[in-house]
Design a protein with these regions (language model features):
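SDR active-site lid
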Residues: 65-160
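Active-site loop immediately N-terminal to the catalytic Tyr-X3-Lys motif
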Residues: 39-44
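A hydrophobic alpha-helix adjacent to the NAD(P)-binding/active-site core of NAD(P)-dependent oxidoreductases
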Residues: 1-2
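A short helix-coil junction within the Rossmann-fold of NAD(P)-dependent oxidoreductases
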Residues: 15-24
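Active-site helix of classical SDR
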Residues: 13, 48
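Active-site-adjacent segment of SDR/Rossmann-fold oxidoreductases
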Residues: 19, 37, 58-70
């Protein structure tokens, strides 16, 4: 997961910055609201998105310090209706679900386009994610208790896993 979610962003950012240093423009990395608040069952995913946030924030500071003509934005989507849960390694007793509310992929595409034309430091996609991040910042233990009590159930369908489920590669 780190190879794709973190190192993919690092390598892509480096290539993009080499071009953008000469021509100017916007670097837009896609993170997650889970870079601001962790949820149970998704510890490794949350860690990759925390890493993307830290890298993007540091890169922004470095580019600003060198005077590079590059804006750097971190898009922080909430749960998006993609096949992520169908392909992620599943160690749960049932088929996984994205916790609701789940937003359309077009909302992320629109946010990226918006930030390419109107640079912003960070942009949340999905109001629920922004509310969750704010709650976590101002009421961290209350948010922790809420996540503990709700998120494990919300991420499980209750439907049994098919015997032929094709998960991602996994090694203990």
């Amino acid at each position: 997961l780190f190879d794709t979610n973190y190192w993919g962003v690092v390598h892509g950012s480096r290539v993009a910055c080499a071009h953008l240093r000469q021509h100017g423009g916007a670097l837009i990395n896609v993170g997650s609201v889970l870079s601001d608040v962790a949820i149970p069952i998704q510890g490794t995913y949350c860690a990759t998105k925390h890493a993307v946030k830290g890298y993007t924030d540091a890169l922004r500071l470095e580019l600003e310090a060198e005077g590079a003509p590059i804006s750097v934005t971190l898009i922080k989507p909430s749960a998006i209706d993609t096949p992520y849960v169908q392909h992620a390694k599943n160690l749960l007793p049932s088929e996984p679900l994205n916790p609701s509310p789940v937003y359309a992929p077009d909302t992320v595409a629109e946010a990226i386009l918006h930030c390419a034309e109107n640079p912003e430091r960070d942009l949340y996609v999905g109001g629920a994610g922004m509310m969750l991040a704010e709650a976590s910042h101002h009421l961290p233990r209350v948010t922790d208790k809420l996540m503990e009590s709700m998120m494990i159930k919300q991420q499980q369908s209750g439907e049994p896993k098919p015997a032929n489920r094709q998960d991602s590669l996994y090694a203990p």
